[in-house]
């Protein structure tokens, strides 16, 4: 029966037994008993036992019902109604074999199937019931957690309410401050509206001026049109008359020939002799023409008049091109010809050639060709004297005219120069200059003006004589009439100037005739219009200089041009422009600094206390037995506890049990807060009120205290940093300080984790377990190291904490510190001797952890930080400098000291097989990978478990780094060869400079190497010649081959790889990498082409003078032979001249000529006879009888400023200009014999003058030489120092240009600004002889990290060079107008007290404005070096008070007129005529009053030293009693410099001592004390120092009136305390003018005491 029910789905074709066997076989196939585990077998056994018991029960029941069931089965279902049942019965009865199955299903099999299904359902239900029970358990746990969260929510809500209350108070305070600030904003807005209104007024005035200017332009255009019309009529009439004249001349000539012919025929007939007609007619015509001119010249004075309005034209008809000769009366000697006389056209600009032969043939006149024009250069050179205007545009230059073509008429206006905006500028070509024509005007008008402006007794404007033969001036009165004729000529010129004045209506310069705006232009003027005169004065006696001849001005051109309506671009943008007699100053440059100072002063007020994240209760530490009285007070300013990323300890959720009696033990001392971090509590009153509100009454009440919750309270006190509560709890007996909460956190762990150093110290002193670990194995040291609390780490280490303790995962404190990038903790642990090679369970080392975070500093400390020998830790700066220099190269200590970690640690692989290099490369941490690669034992080819190398997993940047791992870094140097000795001014020039390091890899080819060298040179040249600090990466995007200085790869002469010569593009058999390794090439040297090759590239690189300018200088020397270089002292004149001479010498030698350089130094005793001997001995002067040699001589005359040029060179000017045997000159030798000499044409003469401008009689020499002026404010000198210092910095950094914010760049920029500001101030003071060239600043030291070295060098330069030159220059200027008895030398040797005071004031102003201003050193360090500068202790207030004590109120306006006048040019020693009367009157008053005061105040003449006392007593009348107008004007210039905003503010840098007292402008307050009584604010000494440019006060007794609507600026000068009450009530403030109202001091006061105190209350600036 049991087997029959084994099959649930019987098969009709098989017996039940077979079905059961098939089911058993299927069950065997489904699972194998052998594979079951022990528990599974037990379960199977239990199931099978239950199955057997169930089967037994079924069997018993079936046996009881057996009989009934069989009867029912066999017979109960058969009836007559169902024929199918009968068929079944018959089937079963008839079938004999057992193979047939019954027709219907066996009931037992059905029962078995039902039982199996029920068992399956029972199993499913049991599984679902178990799952439901587990879900019910989870639900219960979640309910418990929800309840806990609700309780926590209630607590947080209560805290939030408290925080809201506190925040509400803070918000009220902020609202109050906002109201105050809004009031200030309204005030500032009102001020802004006022300023904008003034600006609108100025704009309206400017628009009106523009309209007037446009109207004037229209009128001038109309007048020009009229003049053009008239001139065209005149031209027509002239041409008609000229044609008629030519016809008459031809007819006259024919008649003369016929007459001569007839006379000859008559003579022949008379004589009756037979003569042969051998002479041809043209020959006789030519001879007769010569005779005619000769007779005209000898008989009467003849003049050749050439029309100026016609251009050069040539025709085949030579008869019409002869100059017209007409007689002039000898008695008058007038250089002018009557208006009816018409001249002919000049054939060439250089036709006339002064000669001895009176009869110059026509062929000689025509033979001269048109001179070639020098190509216009990108950089213009001012060659013929100082230039004060803008450089003309070379693009408008007219090309040279061919000799056989007539230029078109439309080209004539293009000849005019482009400098209509500029003052007079000297010509660029020598010996003489051309007169400028204004652009936009018709050349005929210019010609008319030019004609009346010339001087007929001089050579013409181009230095050429006329085309007619020269004739002697036979009139004895001609020279006497020169002045009258000159005045007449000037009158006509002024009349014509109405139509030829420049378009830009610039006012003419004061003190100069109105026609002084005539400029000059480049050599285009060679083909321009000109006037020819016949009469010529003998060269031995120089003619008087025409007043308007450019290049011959009697007054040297000033270094700074007059300010016009269009300000010159060379001036600074904040320079005040003089427009319509009103001075408009731009915004002062000191505003940003002023804002910064104000922000610093408002800092204590604006920085409100930072609120802690939790409320706090201050617990005051009291002695034993005292009650706690300040428990409930709130400390708003407490710092929040620094717990970044940390969870609150679990034990803090417990309820509090507060004792009712608290006693203090005197053994627990309060811990100072000085050792706490900024994030920790900064006092003993630390935060403690994060608990329930019942803390205060419980603590204040008495009674016994239960000890049940004390460990929990201890945990909270330690976690929150409550030192007071912690010390109270530690004093109780029976308290377990090592108690751990559920997470295993002890009180020491919580304190260390949160960084509470004081709490850690208290717990450690109470003998808490220092190595107590939590449930994860982390000790307090691990927690502190992970959170970066280095002070706690240091404290725990000092208490012998286990520094190598490993947590459950193997993490040590060092590993945790590296993982979080806490380098202070890493340093402390390393110095304590921790093990760097401890590995975690995953195989990670601290190196893996540091690299994984990408922290370079941590990795460097791990690899390079050594354990101190005696336990002294390295200084932080030393350790950083020793390991943090990535690009130091050979200078880096890493290249000297080896890494301290072994190679095994660097190459250690973790569980996945990854080394630290794998991690760094895969994450793209290039810096970390570079540090790892520097370790010699790194194995970059090591593979991980996936068979990948470091290169396989690296990013692109890291792959590039790995590829360059074995690359050779070869430094690339530029060499300029040998530099000449230092006497040529080249002692500061460097021979070699390292520009970069080339990376040569194994796969680098020679083509790639050539491209790299060329690109590196190009980038370097562009970087050093740029305007800003460029790095090599910034330059690579620029594809231009030439730099601003003209150097490129084409400037290379040769390249050496080590010692092997190589050229760009050359290839060797070996690769560059193998070649460098084999030849051991340590450097690559590039040699530039120099003078030896006839090039100037090396000179350009050594001196930083652009190559185009050097080539232009060389062209001038080759073309004109006589060139003089002049400029301020130190402008490298000697170096430039010597290098040009060398280059010229080698060029001549290459051309096959022998050449020699002769150098002579000129001193005060150098005489004309010595110069003559030099010329004769060097074969420059050759006797007339001797034939010239082919040898070429270069003569260099140095230091010509030490002698008088006019006396030294006067006799040599004529033969130097005309070098031929036809113009000899007689010289007398030392033996008394005289002989005729002439200058050799192959002689080159170059001279140097260390003087900014020529003066006096030296100007007579100017027209005979080509002059090259080296101005300090123009190229090449202007940018030379900047380029030179930038190259020095690049060389110092091994080719790597630092960033602009680098201290080295700042100190170099400061040195550069010192040179520029110094020269700017000296030019304003009118002392051009004190100007300095850049040579003195080339030795500026560049020491990275030591800016003090540069400041010390600057002090030596100031004391040794600058200050003596300034003193000498100011004394010489102040002594110019002394009496004859008191000469200049006497004044220099024995200067008066006034002169000494002026010198001291000038030195102090220059030092503060030009030198100390802008120094990047901190104020404290700068004050230490200020004492090294001489002249810095003079009080600047003396300059402000000068000349005011002697004035009455009525004289204030007159002083204003003087002060607001245009600044005098530096080159003029005489005052403008309109300025003299006022100054001379004031000077006499000052002199008289000062003499009286000298007698009355003789006892006050001594001055207390500033070093002994801060108070300075001065008798101003006695100290500044000046005796000349020039001194008075010099002092006024100093006053304007003190208050000028166009220069840097003097008040920013003052004495290091507090000798200047500054106040804010008091507006309309009558007395300054009333202002001080307002809102006060104590400031520190740093804020009292005169760094702020706006804490000033203006005091004056005179009326505060404005001139021409321009308001006055407040004074930046200090105010004497004794005269504080003299502030005027009507003082006004403004920032639109650079003039200053001066302090007026009563005459009756004998002395003014300048008391200065450090701790004074100053009024806050009212911004």
Swiss-Prot record:
Residues 1653-1663 have a biased composition (Basic and acidic residues). PROSITE patterns: ANK_REP_REGION, ANK_REPEAT. Residues 1-23, 203-222, 367-440, 454-478, 498-616, 1449-1482, 1581-1663 are annotated as: Disordered. Residues 583-593, 1582-1599, 1639-1648 have a biased composition (Polar residues). The modification Asymmetric dimethylarginine is found at residue 498. Residues 386-396, 1624-1638 have a biased composition (Low complexity). Keywords: ANK repeat, Cell projection, Coiled coil, Cytoplasm, Methylation, Phosphoprotein, Repeat, Synapse. Disulfide bonds: none annotated. Pfam families: AAA_lid_NAV1, Ank, Ank_2, CortBP2. Residues 119-276 form a coiled coil. The modification Phosphoserine is found at residue 1524. InterPro entries: Ankyrin_rpt, Ankyrin_rpt-contain_sf, Cortactin-Actin_Reg, Cortactin-binding_p2_N. Highest expression in brain. Also expressed in kidney, pancreas, lung, heart, liver, skeletal muscle and placenta. It is found in: Cytoplasm, Cell cortex; Cell projection, Dendritic spine. GO terms for biological process: regulation of modification of postsynaptic actin cytoskeleton; regulation of synapse organization. One of its GO terms (molecular function) is SH3 domain binding. Regulates the dendritic spine distribution of CTTN/cortactin in hippocampal neurons, and thus controls dendritic spinogenesis and dendritic spine maintenance. Associates with the striatin-interacting phosphatase and kinase (STRIPAK) core complex to regulate dendritic spine distribution of the STRIPAK complex in hippocampal neurons. PANTHER family: CTTNBP2 N-TERMINAL-LIKE PROTEIN, FILAMIN/GPBP-INTERACTING PROTEIN. Interacts with CTTN/cortactin SH3 domain. Interacts with STRN, STRN4/zinedin and MOB4/phocein; this interactions mediate the association with the STRIPAK core complex and may regulate dendritic spine distribution of the STRIPAK complex in hippocampal neurons. Activation of glutamate receptors weakens the interaction with STRN and STRN4. This is Cortactin-binding protein 2.
């Amino acid at each position: 029966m049991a087997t029959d029910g084994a099959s649930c789905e019987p098969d009709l074709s098989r017996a039940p037994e077979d079905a059961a066997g098939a089911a058993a076989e299927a069950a065997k196939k489904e699972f194998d008993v052998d594979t079951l585990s022990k528990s599974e077998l037990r379960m199977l056994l239990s199931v099978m036992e239950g199955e057997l018991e169930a089967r037994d029960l079924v069997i018993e029941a079936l046996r009881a019902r057996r009989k009934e069931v069989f009867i029912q089965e066999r017979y109960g279902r058969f009836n007559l109604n169902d024929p199918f049942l009968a068929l079944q019965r018959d089937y079963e009865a008839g079938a004999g074999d057992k193979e047939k199955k019954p027709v219907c299903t066996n009931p037992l099999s059905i029962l078995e199937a039902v039982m199996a299904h029920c068992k399956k359902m029972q199993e499913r239900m049991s599984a679902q019931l178990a799952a439901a029970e587990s879900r019910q358990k989870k639900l219960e746990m979640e309910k418990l957690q929800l309840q806990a969260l609700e309780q926590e929510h209630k607590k947080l809500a209560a805290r939030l309410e408290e925080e809201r209350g506190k925040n509400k108070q803070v918000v009220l305070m902020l609202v109050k401050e906002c109201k105050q600030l809004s009031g200030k904003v309204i005030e500032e807005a009102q001020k802004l509206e006022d300023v904008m209104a003034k600006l609108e007024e100025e704009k309206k005035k400017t628009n009106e001026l523009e309209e007037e200017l446009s109207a004037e332009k229209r009128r001038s255009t109309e007048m020009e049109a009229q003049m053009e019309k008239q001139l065209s009529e005149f031209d027509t009439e002239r041409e008609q008359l000229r044609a008629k004249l030519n016809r008459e001349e031809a007819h006259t000539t024919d008649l003369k020939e016929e007459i001569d012919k007839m006379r000859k025929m008559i003579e022949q007939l008379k004589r009756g002799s037979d003569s042969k007609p051998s002479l041809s007619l043209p020959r006789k015509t030519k001879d007769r023409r010569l005779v005619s001119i000769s007779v005209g010249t000898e008989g009467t004075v003849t003049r050749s008049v050439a029309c100026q309005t016609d251009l050069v034209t040539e025709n085949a008809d030579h008869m019409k091109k002869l100059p017209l000769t007409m007689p002039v009366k000898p008695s008058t000697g007038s250089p002018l010809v009557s208006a009816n006389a018409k001249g002919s056209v000049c054939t060439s600009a250089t036709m006339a050639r002064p000669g001895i032969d009176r009869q110059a043939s026509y062929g000689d006149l025509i033979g001269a060709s048109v001179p070639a024009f020098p190509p216009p250069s990108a950089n213009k050179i001012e060659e013929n004297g100082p230039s004060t205007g803008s450089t003309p545009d070379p693009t408008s230059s007219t090309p040279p005219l061919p000799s056989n073509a007539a230029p078109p008429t439309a080209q004539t206006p293009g000849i005019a120069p482009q400098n209509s905006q500029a003052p007079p500028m000297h010509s660029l070509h020598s010996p003489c200059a051309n007169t400028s024509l204004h652009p936009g005007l018709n050349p005929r008008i210019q010609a008319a003006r030019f004609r009346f402006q010339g001087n007929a007794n001089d050579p013409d404007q181009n230095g050429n004589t006329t085309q007619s033969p020269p004739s002697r001036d036979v009139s004895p009165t001609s020279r006497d009439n020169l002045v009258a004729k000159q005045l007449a000529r000037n009158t006509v010129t002024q009349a014509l100037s109405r139509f030829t004045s420049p378009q830009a209506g610039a006012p003419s310069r004061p003190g100069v005739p109105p026609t002084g705006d005539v400029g000059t232009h480049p050599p285009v003027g060679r083909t321009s219009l000109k006037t020819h005169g016949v009469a010529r004065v003998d060269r031995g006696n120089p003619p008087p200089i025409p007043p308007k001849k450019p290049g011959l001005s009697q007054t040297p051109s000033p270094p700074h041009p007059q300010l016009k309506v269009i300000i010159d671009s060379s001036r600074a943008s904040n320079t005040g422009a003089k427009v319509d007699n009103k001075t408009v100053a731009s915004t002062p440059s000191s505003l940003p600094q002023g804002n910064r100072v104000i922000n610093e002063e408002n800092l204590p007020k604006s920085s409100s206390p930072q609120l802690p994240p939790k409320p706090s209760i201050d617990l005051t530490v009291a002695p034993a037995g005292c009650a706690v009285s300040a428990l409930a007070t709130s400390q708003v300013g407490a710092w929040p506890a620094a717990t970044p990323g940390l969870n609150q300890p679990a034990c803090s959720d417990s309820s509090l049990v507060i004792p009712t009696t608290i006693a203090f033990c005197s053994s627990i001392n309060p811990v100072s807060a000085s050792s706490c971090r900024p994030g920790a509590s900064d006092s003993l009153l630390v935060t403690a009120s994060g608990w329930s509100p019942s803390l205060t009454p419980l603590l204040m009440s008495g009674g016994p205290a239960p000890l049940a919750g004390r460990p929990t309270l201890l945990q909270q006190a330690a976690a929150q940093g409550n030192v007071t509560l912690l010390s109270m709890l530690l004093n109780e007996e029976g308290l377990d300080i090592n108690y751990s909460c559920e997470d295993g956190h002890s009180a020491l762990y919580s304190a260390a984790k949160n960084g509470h150093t004081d709490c850690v110290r208290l717990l450690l002193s109470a003998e808490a377990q220092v190595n107590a670990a939590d449930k994860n194995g982390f000790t307090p040291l691990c927690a502190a190291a992970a959170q970066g609390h280095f002070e706690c780490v240091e404290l725990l280490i000092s208490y012998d904490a286990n520094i190598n303790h490993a947590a459950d995962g193997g993490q040590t404190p060092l590993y945790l510190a590296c993982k979080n990038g806490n380098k202070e903790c890493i340093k402390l642990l390393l110095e304590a001797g921790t093990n760097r090679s401890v590995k975690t369970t995953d195989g990670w080392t601290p190196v893996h952890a540091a690299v994984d975070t990408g922290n370079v500093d941590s990795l460097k400390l791990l690899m390079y930080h050594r354990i101190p020998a005696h336990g002294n830790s390295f200084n932080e700066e030393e350790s950083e400098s020793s390991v943090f220099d990535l690009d130091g190269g050979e200078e880096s200590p890493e290249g000297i000291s080896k890494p301290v970690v072994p190679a095994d640690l660097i190459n250690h692989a973790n569980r996945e097989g990854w080394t630290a290099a794998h991690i760094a490369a895969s994450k793209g941490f290039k810096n970390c990978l570079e540090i790892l690669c520097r370790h010699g034992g790194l194995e970059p080819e090591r593979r991980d478990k996936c068979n990948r190398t470091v290169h396989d997993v690296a990013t692109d940047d890291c792959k590039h780094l790995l590829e360059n791992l074995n690359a050779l870094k070869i430094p690339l140097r530029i060499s300029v060869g040998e530099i000449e000795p230092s006497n040529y001014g080249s002692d500061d020039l460097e021979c070699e400079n390292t520009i970069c390091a080339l990376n040569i890899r194994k796969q680098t080819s020679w083509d790639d190497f050539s491209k790299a060298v060329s690109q590196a040179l190009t980038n370097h040249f562009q970087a050093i010649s740029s305007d800003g600090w460029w790095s090599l990466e910034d330059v690579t995007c620029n594809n231009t081959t030439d730099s601003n200085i003209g150097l490129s790869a084409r400037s290379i002469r040769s390249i050496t790889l080590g010692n092997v010569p190589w050229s760009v593009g050359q290839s060797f058999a070996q690769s560059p990498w193998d070649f460098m390794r084999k030849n051991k090439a340590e450097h690559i040297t590039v040699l530039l082409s120099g003078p030896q090759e006839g090039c100037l590239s090396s000179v350009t690189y050594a001196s930083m003078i652009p190559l185009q300018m050097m080539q232009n200088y060389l062209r001038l020397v080759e073309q004109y032979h006589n060139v003089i270089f002049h400029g301020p002292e130190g402008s490298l004149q000697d170096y430039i001249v010597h290098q040009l001479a060398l280059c010229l010498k080698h060029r001549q030698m290459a051309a096959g000529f022998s050449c020699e350089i002769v150098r002579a130094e000129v001193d005060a005793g150098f005489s004309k006879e010595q110069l003559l001997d030099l010329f004769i001995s060097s074969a420059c002067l050759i006797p007339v009888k001797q034939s010239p040699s082919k040898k070429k001589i270069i003569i260099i005359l140095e230091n010509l400023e030490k002698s008088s040029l006019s006396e030294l060179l006067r006799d040599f000017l004529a033969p130097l200009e005309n070098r031929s045997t036809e113009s000899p000159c007689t010289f007398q030798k030392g033996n008394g014999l005289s002989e005729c000499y002439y200058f050799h044409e192959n002689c080159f003469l170059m001279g140097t003058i260390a003087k900014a401008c020529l003066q006096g009689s030296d100007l007579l020499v100017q027209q005979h030489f080509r002059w090259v002026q080296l101005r300090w404010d123009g190229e090449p000198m202007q940018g030379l120092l900047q380029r030179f210092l930038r190259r020095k910095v690049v060389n110092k950094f091994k080719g790597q240009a630092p960033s602009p914010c680098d201290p080295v760049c700042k100190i170099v920029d400061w040195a550069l600004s010192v040179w520029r500001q110094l020269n700017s101030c000296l030019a304003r003071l009118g002392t051009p002889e004190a100007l300095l060239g850049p040579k003195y600043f080339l030795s500026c030291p560049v020491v990275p990290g030591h800016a003090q070295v540069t400041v010390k060098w600057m002090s030596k330069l100031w004391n040794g060079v600058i200050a003596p030159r300034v003193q000498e220059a100011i004394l010489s200027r102040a002594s110019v107008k002394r009496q004859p008895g008191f000469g200049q030398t006497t004044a220099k040797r024995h200067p008066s007290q006034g002169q000494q005071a002026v010198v001291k004031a000038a030195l102090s102003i220059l030092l503060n404005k030009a030198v100390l201003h802008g120094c990047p050193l901190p104020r404290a360090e700068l004050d230490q070096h200020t004492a090294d500068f001489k002249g810095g202790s003079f009080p600047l207030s003396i300059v402000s008070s000068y000349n005011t004590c002697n004035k009455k109120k009525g004289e204030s306006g007159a002083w204003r007129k003087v002060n607001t006048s245009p600044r005098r040019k530096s080159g003029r020693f005489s005052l403008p005529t309109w300025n003299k009367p006022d100054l001379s009157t004031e000077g006499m008053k000052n002199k008289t009053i000062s003499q009286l005061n000298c007698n009355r105040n003789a006892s006050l003449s001594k001055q207390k030293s500033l070093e002994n006392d801060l108070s300075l007593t001065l008798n101003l009348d006695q100290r500044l009693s000046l005796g000349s107008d020039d001194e008075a004007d010099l002092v006024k210039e100093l006053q304007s410099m003190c208050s000028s905003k166009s220069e840097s503010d003097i008040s920013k840098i003052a004495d290091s001592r507090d000798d200047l007292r500054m106040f804010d402008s008091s507006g309309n307050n009558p007395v300054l004390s009333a202002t001080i009584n307002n809102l006060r604010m104590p400031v520190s000494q740093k804020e009292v120092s005169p760094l702020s440019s706006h804490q000033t006060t203006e005091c004056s007794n005179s009326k505060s009136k404005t001139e021409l609507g321009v308001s006055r600026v407040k004074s930046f000068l200090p105010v004497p305390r004794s005269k504080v009450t003299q502030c005027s009530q009507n003082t006004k403030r403004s920032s639109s003018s650079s003039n200053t109202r001066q302090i007026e001091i009563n005459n009756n006061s004998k002395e003014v005491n300048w008391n200065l105190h450090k701790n004074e209350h100053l009024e806050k600036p009212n911004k």
